[in-house]
């Protein structure tokens, strides 16, 4: 029994492992380029079966806890390995021994509490290494990165347990493009630990407290170009001049991101910045100022020197007590050399006039996403304000009048570029006043419905995209670039109004087509972006766009954004791929040809009908059908006459005086139907003929030259022809009153001619002795 249980357990383990392995394989997908993706696939281990074909492997957000020596052994061509956000706590010493081609390694946010230099020794090609978010206290007992001579980006540290930076940690590293250290809970820093790195383009420091900040600053000031401080509380920061003996600084940009600061500590920070002789750019992102802007003027005048700072950027600055904020008059003297200022999304509603006047070197001012209105803007742009200003950005403020905005800015004599997009102007007056040197105006997303003469004619660049424009007819003789996408225009602007235009972006409008003539009218146009419109793919439009090879150089979004909207059977297809049929492209010629062919067919039919009496056949058919539709007064078997006699009026004497006398006076008498005597007056002749034939046992045709020539006889014979012969009966009796040639009988009476050729007919004898026999034969024929 124990043996049986043991076997069952072994089989269960094997089945479980096989299921897990098949699940791992199913969660990994690789393309032909060796890019394998298996992120968020609930993998418990690195899938087996990986070969040298794999070049990139993404196994992030899984449940991998262990990496063995054999997991990646065959991946000799692997260039990128991403294992972030797993549960990795153990990596065997030689796990990466075959990864000499690896360039990108991400082991962030796992459970690696101890780092080993043996992992990284084989990685001679590594340029990116991310070890953030692992619970190690230090960067190992020996230098981890001394063999990584090609390393460019390094990220180390964590928020909770990384407490110590040692001099050996960065030994061997001489140049890095980016170094990020999460030292949020740093408690110990060995001097000159970061000094071993000769050059770092961008250093990012996460530090909750500022205790060790000055020590680190001393080490990096001569090797770092851009220093970024994150998540730091500087409320109690105090600068000690004795802490720094270094004045030869390489730092050109200093960024404070998510930093807390007070009026006093900001003053201390500025004293620190004084030590950076080459500082050109200062940036504050998502910072909190727990103060009211009350900087001590005496200390500022004595200590603070703005140096060479040219660019100041402030984004999303939070001032809890902004309603008590000072006018910054204590900082006026520090602003005279600044050339570029950005204060974005920081609830700015006014720039004091005196401050504006002190910004003598300011060339670029960005006050986007604030609370500026025309009244306060007028105070900010007072006389002698911003004398050097060339670019002013007031995007997404609370401006409402174009006319007032333009008048307010007239004091800025050197202003050439104005961005007032994302304000709600709605309408545009007929005329406006603007600074005389204006070259660029951005009115995108301002809800305007039309453009007027308010637009200055000095413009070289105009952006009116994302509005409600359905017409653009401004004469702008100097305009070189027009951005008018996402409006309601149905055609390209008139080129004669824009003679200098180089760039036109008119995508996502209501344009359905444009022609070669329209494009050629823009003599200077170099770039056109017209995708995203609902194009009618007519033959002319397709011919123009598909045959012009040079058009692809002008249309920068060709061919992906040029889709057909109609005809319906090509909707959604790219214009360059659509092919229309000949009938769609040459409809006029096709219809003309069909009309000509139809005319010739009708003409030919007419000739044939005339030649072969087709009209007669149609008349007979119609007459017969009409007669057949009329109700009969007598049943088809109700015979009233022995014979219906068809004859010419010129032969009436023979019929009435000889034939009638011989037949009707015979005993028993024959009853004959004669049209002169028996037709019902006033009745349609067709009905009389048809009724008489149907009520007669036989039909006697008295043929003569007169019969053939008589219009009446032909008319009578026409309407009796179908009835006589459509059932192939023998009801016809032919009497040849005088010799006539068969050729004299019309061709259309084909059955009559056939009967004369195939059946015996009675011939009126000239000899009186033979006439008695004639009458005997006639009476016998009628009775048969």
Swiss-Prot record:
Induction: (Microbial infection) In macrophages, induced by SARS-CoV-2 infection. Highly expressed in peripheral blood leukocytes, in particular in monocytes, in bone marrow, lymph node and in spleen. Also detected in lung and in fetal liver. Levels are low in other tissues. It is a single-pass type I membrane protein. Residues 1-20 form the signal peptide. The record marks 349 as: Interaction with bacterial lipopeptide. The chain crosses the membrane at residues 589-609. Residues 525-579 form the LRRCT domain. A motif (ATG16L1-binding motif) lies at residues 761-778. It holds the Pfam family LRR_8. There is a cross-link at residue 754 (Glycyl lysine isopeptide (Lys-Gly) (interchain with G-Cter in ubiquitin)). Glycosylation of Asn-442 is critical for secretion of the N-terminal ectodomain of TLR2. Ubiquitinated at Lys-754 by PPP1R11, leading to its degradation. Deubiquitinated by USP2. Changing residue 442 to D: Prevents addition of N-glycans. Prevents secretion of the N-terminal ectodomain. InterPro entries: Cys-rich_flank_reg_C (IPR000483), Leu-rich_rpt (IPR001611), Leu-rich_rpt_typical-subtyp (IPR003591), LRR_dom_sf (IPR032675), TIR_dom (IPR000157), Toll-like_receptor (IPR017241), Toll_tir_struct_dom_sf (IPR035897). Changing residue 751 to R: Reduced protein stability. Belongs to the Toll-like receptor family. Interacts with LY96, TLR1 and TLR6 (via extracellular domain). TLR2 seems to exist in heterodimers with either TLR1 or TLR6 before stimulation by the ligand. The heterodimers form bigger oligomers in response to their corresponding ligands as well as further heterotypic associations with other receptors such as CD14 and/or CD36. Binds MYD88 (via TIR domain). Interacts with TICAM1. Interacts with CNPY3. Interacts with ATG16L1. Interacts with PPP1R11. Interacts with TICAM2. Interacts with TIRAP. (Microbial infection) Interacts with M.tuberculosis EsxA. Cooperates with LY96 to mediate the innate immune response to bacterial lipoproteins and other microbial cell wall components. Cooperates with TLR1 or TLR6 to mediate the innate immune response to bacterial lipoproteins or lipopeptides. Acts via MYD88 and TRAF6, leading to NF-kappa-B activation, cytokine secretion and the inflammatory response. May also activate immune cells and promote apoptosis in response to the lipid moiety of lipoproteins. This is Toll-like receptor 2. It comes from Homo sapiens (Human).
């Amino acid at each position: 029994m124990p043996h049986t249980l043991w076997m069952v357990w072994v089989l269960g383990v094997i089945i479980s492992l096989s299921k897990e392995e098949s699940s791992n394989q199913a969660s990994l997908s690789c393309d032909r380029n060796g890019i394998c993706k298996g992120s968020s696939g609930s993998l418990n281990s690195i899938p087996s079966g990986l070969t040298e074909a794999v070049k990139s492997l993404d196994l992030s957000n899984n449940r991998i806890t262990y990496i063995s020596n054999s997991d990646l052994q065959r991946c000799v061509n692997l260039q990128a390995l991403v294992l972030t956000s797993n549960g990795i706590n153990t990596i065997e010493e030689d796990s990466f021994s075959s990864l000499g081609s690896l360039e990108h390694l991400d082991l962030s946010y796992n459970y690696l509490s101890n780092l080993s230099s043996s992992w990284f020794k084989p990685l001679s090609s590594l340029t990116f290494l991310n070890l953030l978010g692992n619970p190690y206290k230090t960067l190992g007992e020996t230098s981890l990165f001394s063999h990584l001579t090609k390393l460019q980006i390094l990220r180390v540290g964590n928020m909770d347990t990384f407490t110590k930076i040692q001099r050996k940690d960065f030994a061997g590293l001489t140049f890095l493009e980016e170094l990020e250290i999460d030292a949020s809970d740093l408690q110990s820093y060995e001097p000159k630990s970061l000094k071993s790195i000769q050059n770092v383009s961008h250093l990012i420091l996460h530090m909750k407290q500022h205790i060790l900040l000055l020590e680190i600053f001393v080490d990096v000031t001569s090797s770092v170009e851009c220093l970024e401080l994150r998540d730091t509380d500087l409320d109690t920061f105090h600068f000690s001049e004795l802490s720094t003996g270094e004045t030869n600084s390489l730092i050109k940009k200093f960024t404070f991101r998510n930093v807390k600061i007070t009026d006093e500590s900001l003053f201390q920070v500025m004293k620190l910045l004084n030590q950076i002789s080459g500082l050109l750019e200062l940036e504050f992102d998502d910072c909190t100022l727990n103060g009211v802007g009350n900087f001590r003027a005496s200390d500022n005048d004595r200590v603070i020197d703005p140096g060479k700072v040219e660019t100041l950027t402030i984004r999303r600055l939070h001032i809890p007590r902004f309603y008590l904020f000072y006018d910054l008059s204590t900082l006026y003297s520090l602003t005279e050399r600044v050339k570029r200022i950005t204060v974005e999304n920081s609830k700015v509603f006014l720039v004091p006039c005196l401050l504006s006047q002190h910004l003598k070197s300011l060339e670029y001012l960005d006050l986007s996403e604030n609370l500026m209105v025309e009244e306060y803007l007028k105070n900010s742009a007072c006389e002698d304000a911003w004398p050097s200003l060339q670019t002013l950005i007031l995007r997404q403020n609370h401006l409402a009048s174009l006319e007032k905005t333009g008048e307010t800015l007239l004091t800025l004599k050197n202003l050439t570029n104005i961005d007032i997009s994302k304000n709600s102007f709605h309408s545009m007056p007929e005329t406006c006043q603007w600074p005389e040197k204006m070259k660029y105006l951005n009115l995108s997303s301002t809800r305007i419905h039309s453009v007027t003469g308010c637009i200055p004619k000095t413009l070289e660049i105009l952006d009116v995209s994302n509005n409600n424009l359905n017409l653009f007819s401004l004469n702008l003789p100097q305009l070189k670039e027009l951005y008018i996408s996402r409006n309601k225009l149905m055609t390209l602007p008139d080129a004669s109004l824009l003679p200098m235009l180089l760039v036109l972006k008119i995508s996502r409008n209501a344009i359905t087509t444009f022609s070669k003539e329209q494009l050629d009218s823009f003599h200077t146009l170099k770039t056109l972006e017209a995708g995203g419109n609902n194009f009618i793919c007519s033959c002319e439009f397709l011919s123009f766009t598909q045959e012009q090879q040079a058009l692809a150089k002008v249309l920068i979004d060709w061919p992906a954004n040029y889709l057909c909207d109609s005809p319906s059977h090509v909707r959604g297809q790219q214009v360059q791929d659509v092919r229309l049929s000949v009938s769609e492209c040459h409809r006029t010629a096709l219809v003309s040809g069909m009309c000509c062919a139809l005319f010739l067919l009708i003409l030919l039919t007419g000739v044939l009908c005339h030649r072969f009496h087709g009209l007669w056949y149609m008349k007979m058919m119609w007459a017969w059908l009409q007669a057949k539709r009329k109700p009969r007064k007598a049943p088809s078997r109700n015979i009233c006459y022995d014979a219906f006699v068809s004859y010419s009026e010129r032969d009436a004497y023979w019929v009435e005086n000889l034939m009638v006398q011989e037949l009707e006076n015979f005993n028993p008498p024959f009853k004959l139907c004669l049209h002169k005597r028996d037709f019902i007056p006033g009745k349609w002749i067709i009905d009389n003929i048809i009724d008489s034939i149907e009520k007669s046992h036989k039909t006697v045709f008295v043929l003569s030259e007169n019969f053939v020539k008589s219009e009446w006889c032909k008319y009578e014979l026409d309407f009796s022809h179908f009835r006589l012969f459509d059932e192939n009966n023998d009801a016809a009796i032919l009497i040849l009153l005088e010799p006539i040639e068969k050729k004299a009988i019309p061709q259309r009476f084909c059955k009559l001619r056939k009967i004369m050729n195939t059946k015996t007919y009675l011939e009126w004898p000239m000899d009186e002795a033979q006439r008695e026999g004639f009458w005997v034969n006639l009476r016998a024929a009628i009775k048969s």
